[in-house]
């Protein structure tokens, strides 16, 4: 007697739904859900032409990848492999430039602004001022909290890259001098560009080149790693898929993109160690794996989990291969790996006086001070890196590779779970966990390649289509880096008819002039309002110091009792004075709120400029009434009674 058939789902269809539905849901949320339910980051409508350029570039690369993979032999010659990796490198840089163009009218200028900025890369500001390396290392932990928001939470490795750039360029002062006219205006977001010499400025260009080269060397190591596991076709697929993941394209100038090098180098060395358990090269591989982890943690303490990925992968592979039959050998290799990691740190402590414990405690204290709700972020943390590593590949690497690559799947999933549950991250995991991305891509390529080397082209085409769509929407809409505005793109404002004109000037030679302002005359206690200032840079060269604007509304010229106290970087924090162009007019709006207990009457409006870093006020060159380098505006600020109709 026939049994009634139940409803069954075709396994391939189930896999496609698992891979595709999260991506489609995410793209839908990006486009139509303005809340942050599924999308953590801020969003903005992209300009049409740059978005079309990016989408075209992604589609072209996808087509090239499919065409190449359809024609690749099972085994590549060294020339074929080199040509393929050269293409991936060039395609990656080109796609990165197109992605940067979404938010930067001039992408190369934008990369420079990011590199020098206190608000983004952040490391340049520290690195260029390191003259005595050993002395700086000795006092590093004491100075960390005086650094900007990024450098204060990291070990000294990244500033040392810029120190290296300075040392390499010192013997070539003519080259640095030739670059200076181009680079100095691009360093204006450093806030103190006037204090940088030509060689230090050129070191910023060195940093841009090194970061870009390092970021697009990741698919090269990815090829090497996957080649060891599954052959040339899977390796080629992994390298070709990597430029389609959003995080590799939109974090230009952020060193986190390159931290996947440490993940891959560790895994490659683990494989080398396993392949030669009792030979010298196996022990050497273990030591160098530890050394790679040292370099990774020297760049960022946040790279410590790479040790967990490598350790769990090694243990799982050893168990599968040997069931611990060679445990004394493996224990010795583990000791060598620990020496490779801890030995250089010990040398820095003993020889340079570096305070490792103090630096780590300071970095973690500042990092963990960022408040994030626990349970929402237990889910947000993995979701964020899933979206930046490409949702189709992340779903494959999490759910579908347990049979194809159990050790690697276990290593990365367990590390991800531990990171999320321990709550050591504080948001932005799509950036700071980019060391997971090449592992995710590797697992995706392993699943898309059969054990005998054949490629699953139907699934591959589906995955590439999803990746292309997600990358275009994700990069086009999300806004993850903000440092300010390119001064040459700032429109010249039209002076309003109700402008109150002034002859107020600041700086020793009157380089900064307040052309005028607009403010309404009467306010009530607790009321919010705006004051629009119109500045002009009347000097002939760039301004050497970044100034903030302060606005005080006070009962006396001595500035004792304030009912308004507002300050900020000009143009809504987007344009420090160091970026103002000679002759440029700046519209600078400030929003304020009158104190709720303000008494009715007339008040003075005092304005001025002060150094962002020291707090010292700028010299008042011209003003009718000035007290303590603050200028009283001609208009009076009137607070009306709350009972007044």
Show where each model-derived region lies.
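Membrane-lumen/periplasm interface segments of specific transmembrane helices
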Residues: 22-37, 295, 309-312, 316-399
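Short acidic/glycine- and proline-prone juxtamembrane loop motifs at membrane-interface regions
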Residues: 247, 251-259
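Membrane-interface helix-loop-helix junctions at transmembrane boundaries of multi-pass membrane enzymes
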Residues: 7-13, 278-281, 321-332, 397-413
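Hydrophobic, aromatic-rich transmembrane alpha-helices
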Residues: 63-71, 386-420, 442
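Membrane-interface alpha helices of multi-pass inner-membrane proteins
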Residues: 243-250, 282-301, 307-311
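Start-transfer (signal-anchor) and selected internal transmembrane alpha helices
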Residues: 1-21, 47-115, 333-337
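Transmembrane-helix signature of polytopic, membrane-embedded enzymes
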Residues: 175, 182-244
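C-terminal luminal/periplasmic domains and tails of membrane-associated envelope-modifying transferases
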Residues: 488-645
């Amino acid at each position: 007697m026939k049994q009634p058939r139940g409803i069954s789902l075709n396994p391939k269809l189930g896999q496609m739904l698992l891979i595709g539905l999260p991506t489609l849901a995410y793209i839908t949320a990006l486009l139509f859900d303005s809340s942050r339910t599924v999308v953590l980051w801020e969003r903005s409508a992209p300009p049409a032409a740059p978005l079309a350029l990016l989408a075209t570039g992604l589609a072209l690369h996808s087509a090239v990848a499919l065409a190449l993979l359809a024609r690749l032999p099972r085994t590549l010659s060294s020339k074929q492999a080199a040509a393929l990796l050269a293409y991936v490198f060039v395609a990656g840089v080109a796609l990165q430039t197109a992605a940067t163009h979404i938010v930067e009218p001039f992408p190369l200028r934008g990369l420079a602004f990011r590199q020098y900025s206190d608000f983004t890369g952040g490391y340049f500001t520290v690195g260029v001022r390191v003259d005595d390396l050993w002395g700086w290392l000795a006092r590093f932990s004491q100075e960390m909290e005086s650094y900007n928001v990024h450098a204060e939470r990291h070990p000294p490795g990244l500033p040392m890259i810029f120190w290296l750039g300075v040392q390499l360029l010192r013997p070539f002062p003519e080259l640095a001098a030739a670059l200076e006219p181009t680079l100095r205006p691009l360093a204006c977001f450093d806030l103190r560009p006037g204090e940088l010499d030509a060689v230090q400025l050129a070191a910023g260009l060195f940093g841009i080149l090194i970061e870009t080269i390092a970021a697009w060397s990741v698919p090269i190591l990815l090829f090497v790693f996957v080649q060891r596991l599954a052959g040339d076709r899977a390796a080629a697929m992994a390298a070709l898929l990597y430029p389609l993941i959003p995080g590799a394209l939109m974090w230009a100038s952020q060193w986190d993109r390159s931290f996947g090098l440490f993940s891959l180098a560790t895994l490659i060395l683990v494989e080398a160690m396993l392949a030669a358990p009792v030979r010298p090269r196996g022990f050497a591989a273990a030591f160098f794996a530890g050394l790679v982890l040292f370099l990774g943690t020297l760049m960022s303490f946040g790279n410590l989990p790479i040790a967990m990925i490598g350790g769990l992968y090694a243990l799982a592979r050893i168990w599968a291969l040997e069931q611990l039959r060679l445990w004394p050998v493996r224990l010795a290799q583990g000791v060598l790996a620990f020496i490779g990691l801890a030995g250089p740190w010990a040398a820095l402590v003993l020889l340079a006086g570096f305070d490792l414990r103090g630096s780590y405690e300071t970095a973690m204290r500042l990092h963990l001070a960022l408040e994030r709700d626990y349970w929402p972020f237990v889910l947000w943390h993995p979701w964020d890196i899933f979206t930046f590593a490409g949702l189709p590949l992340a779903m494959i690497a999490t759910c579908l590779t347990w049979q194809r690559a159990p050790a690697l799947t276990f290593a990365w999933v367990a590390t991800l779970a531990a990171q999320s549950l321990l709550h050591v991250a504080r948001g932005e995991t799509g950036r700071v966990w980019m060391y997971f991305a090449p592992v995710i891509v590797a697992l995706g390529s392993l699943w898309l390649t059969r054990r005998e080397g054949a490629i699953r082209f139907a699934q591959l085409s589906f995955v590439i289509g999803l990746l292309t769509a997600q990358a275009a929407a994700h990069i086009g809409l999300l806004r993850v880096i903000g440092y300010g505005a390119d001064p040459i793109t700032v429109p010249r404002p039209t002076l309003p008819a109700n402008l109150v004109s002034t002859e107020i000037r600041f700086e020793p030679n009157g380089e900064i002039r307040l052309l005028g302002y607009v403010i309404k005359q009467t306010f009530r206690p607790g009321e919010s309002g705006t004051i629009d200032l119109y500045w002009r840079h009347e000097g002939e060269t760039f301004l050497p110091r970044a100034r903030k604007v302060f606005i005080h509304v006070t009962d006396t010229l001595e500035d004792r009792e304030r009912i308004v106290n507002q300050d900020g970087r000009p143009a809504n924090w987007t344009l420090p004075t160091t970026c103002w162009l000679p002759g440029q007019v700046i519209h600078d709006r400030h929003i304020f709120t009158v104190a709720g207990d303000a008494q009715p009457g007339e008040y003075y409006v005092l304005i001025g400029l002060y150094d962002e870093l020291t707090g010292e006020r700028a010299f008042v060159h011209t003003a009718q009434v000035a007290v303590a380098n603050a200028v009283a505006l001609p208009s009076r600020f009137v607070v009306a009674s709350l009972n007044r109709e």
